Structures are given as C-alpha cells and as structure tokens.
C-alpha cells in the first residue's frame, strides 16, 4: 500500500499524463526476486553482496538511459564497522549492590558507535526521560530542569502523538523523526548522557523484539566520522518491555502511570532511585568503503530544481556467527522499496518533466 501511494504521488507531483499502468507489477517482482536472492548475500554494505547490488543498480540505470551525476554512478561512503565481543562484554543494572546482568539478545541489545576498541560505564544513575525529545516547535522538552551528564537516559520509543492520535501533537499516529531511535540517541548525546536504554514496545516501534535483536546484534555500521564517533553516546541499547517493568518496580515506580504523564508537555523527568548502570563493551573495529548509487534526469524548464526519490539498497547481509541459513535476504527491507524506486525511475526516464529528477539508492546512516 505504501509503495502504491509513493508511485501515485510521484505521478501527481511531476504532473505527467501517461497512464499509471505503465508501472509494471512484473518488473517489481523481478527486481525483488533478484535483490533478495541468496546470490546477493543480504546486501551488506562493504560485502561481496553489497558490491553485486551496486553493480546491479548501476546497470539498471544505464539500461534506462539515465546518466550519472558526475563521471560514475557511485557516490563514496566511508564506513566504520564495530562488532561487540559479547563473550567479553556486559551490561548490568545494580540495585543495593546487587547487579543484574542483562542477557544479550533475549533481554537487551547493546553496542557503541564510538570507533574504539572498548568503552566502559561505571555507576551511571538511571533517569526516565519520557520520550527523550526536545522539539521547540511543539513546545516540548523532556530534558527540562535536568542535568543528564554522566547519567543513563531511559526512554520510550516513538513520540507522544502515536498514543494520543492527536494530529496537532507531533504528527498524530504517524511517527515523526523525533520518534525514531536514531534521533533519541543523537539528542541524548547532545544532552551529555553517558548511556541510553530505549524501552521496546511492539506497537509504537512497529516491529517485534525479534527485529530489534536481529538488527542490533553483530556488526554495526556507521558513517566514518571525523571525530571517530566521540560525539556519540558511549552505550546505545534497547531493553525489552519485561525488563523495563522489572527495573521500574525496583525503583518503586509505576511505568504505566509514567507513560501517561509522558504524553504531556509538562512532563518532568524522574530519577530511578537506587538504580545504576555498569557496562564494558569490547569492540572489533574495521573500516571499508561503500557507495550510494545515483542517477539524474534533467528537467526541461527548471533543471537546477530537483525532485528527489530515494530508497536504501542495503540490508543486514550475512550473520557469520550463525549456523544454517544465515543470509538475511531483506525482501521487504528493502528490496521492495529499491524495486519500487527502479520502476519509478524507469517510468520517468521516458517522461519529460519541468524539474530535474534525482534517483538515489543509499545506505541510511
């Protein structure tokens, strides 16, 4: 449904008269079948499967007659790859000198985007910060009156609009960027927190714990940054809702009641009394180069104005520490989106438009 909406909206935006039925379902199926096949090894950036994917995209753009932006279709993306050695690492919550080591995978997932061989956190106090959002345009600041430096921010996924369904509150049921896990880690880093625990909940996250466990286990990829990730949170983590319930009970807090309070702009952060986080993460660090793949079609009237259409081409690749079928093919995430983008690009390659069209298949970092 989302893909169909994207296709129809793209037709409206560009003001084309050609019939929608030129978008061929058979082509979508063909691209998905190829990109999600075992031959493409899960399309991990920097892997053989990733290289094969990039070549496939380039070839398809060439078949359409869409030129590259400059010289080549590849736009270089330098990558850092960090893999936590779970045998040598731990994450624990302590109450009254009694540590609870959270099981990696079944109770928590944790990693660091700092490009170092190891990070550690000692006796970091836990504080519940609602949704962990600072959004001046909505009159919202979950960190108000709080110095979170050196502390561990515990927060909910998504934003308050999801629960209230009030279209005037953020974007109602539809998630804004403030609701995404990426934003939450970024904002906590700006606030000076040392670690973050995001509480998983299937409905607002839009995926079950199994997806969290799979996505954040093993190798984590980030853009190779000038500061080597020093501006990032030391420890980024998710915990299950069951673990969260236990922790709030340990702190004599009612999580359900606090969730309701966190739906209002006057919410005030709450110290999780007596709870501290300790962690030691041992990292294996590697670097590689991958690419976004892009093509462009010039507009006839306003060539310096661009309509951007994009989809990420990558997925999880191969989980080398797993036995059996360890290829994460990613048919839905995101061979389907990439296929839709290719079919849109093919359609518009034969259509004259006032503005230029930039087609970008990227690695979302």
Question: What are the roles of these predicted feature ranges?
Answer:
Residues 41-167, 271-273, 281, 290:
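Noncatalytic luminal/extracellular "stalk/propeptide" segments of secretory-pathway proteins
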Residues 4-12:
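Sec-dependent N-terminal signal peptides
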Residues 18-22, 38-48, 78, 89, ...:
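Second-shell loop/turn segments in exported
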Residues 94-96, 108-145, 227-330, 346-350, ...:
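Soluble metallo-hydrolase cores and metallopeptidase-like ectodomains found primarily
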Residues 33-36, 126-129, 152-156, 195-199, ...:
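Structural recognition of the beta-strand scaffold that forms the well-ordered cores
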Residues 173, 177-179, 204, 317, ...:
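Acidic/histidine-rich catalytic neighborhood of metal-dependent amide-processing enzymes
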Residues 131-213, 304:
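A conserved hydrophobic secondary-structure block that centers on an alpha-helix together
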Residues 16-68, 79, 88-89, 209, ...:
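N-terminal hydrophobic or amphipathic helices/low-complexity stretches enriched
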């Amino acid at each position: 449904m989302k893909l169909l909406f994207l296709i129809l909206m793209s037709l409206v935006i560009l003001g084309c008269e050609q019939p929608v039925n030129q978008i061929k379902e058979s082509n979508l199926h063909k691209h998905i079948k190829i990109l999600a096949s075992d031959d493409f090894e899960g399309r991990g950036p920097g892997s053989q499967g990733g290289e094969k994917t990039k070549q496939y995209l380039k070839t398809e753009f060439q078949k359409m007659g869409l030129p590259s932006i400059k010289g080549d279709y590849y736009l270089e993306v330098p990558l850092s790859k960090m893999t936590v050695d779970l045998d040598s690492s731990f994450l624990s919550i302590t109450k009254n000198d009694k540590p609870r080591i959270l099981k990696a995978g079944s109770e928590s997932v944790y990693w660091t985007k700092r490009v170092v061989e190891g990070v550690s956190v000692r006796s970091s106090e836990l504080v519940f910060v609602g949704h962990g959002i600072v959004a001046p345009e909505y009159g919202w600041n979950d960190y108000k009156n709080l110095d979170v430096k050196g502390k561990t921010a515990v927060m909910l996924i998504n934003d308050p609009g999801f629960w209230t369904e009030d279209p005037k509150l953020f974007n109602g049921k539809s998630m804004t960027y403030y609701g995404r896990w990426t934003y939450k880690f970024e904002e906590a880093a700006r606030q000076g927190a040392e670690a973050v625990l995001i509480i998983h909940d299937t409905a607002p996250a839009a995926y079950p714990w199994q997806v969290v466990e799979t996505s954040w286990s093993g190798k984590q990829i980030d853009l190779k940054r000038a500061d080597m990730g020093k501006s990032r949170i030391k420890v980024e983590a998710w915990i299950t809702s069951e673990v969260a319930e236990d922790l709030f009970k340990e702190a004599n807090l009612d999580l359900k009641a606090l969730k309701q309070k966190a739906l209002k702009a006057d919410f005030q952060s709450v110290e999780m009394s007596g709870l501290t986080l300790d962690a030691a993460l041992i990292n294996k660090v590697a670097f590689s180069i991958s690419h976004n793949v892009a093509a462009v079609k010039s507009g006839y009237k306003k060539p310096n104005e661009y309509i951007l259409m994009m989809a990420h081409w990558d997925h999880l690749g191969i989980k080398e520490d797993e036995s059996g079928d360890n290829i994460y093919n990613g048919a839905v995430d995101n061979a389907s989106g990439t296929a839709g983008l290719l079919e849109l690009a093919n359609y518009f390659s034969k259509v004259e438009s006032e503005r230029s069209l930039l087609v970008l298949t990227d690695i979302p970092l």
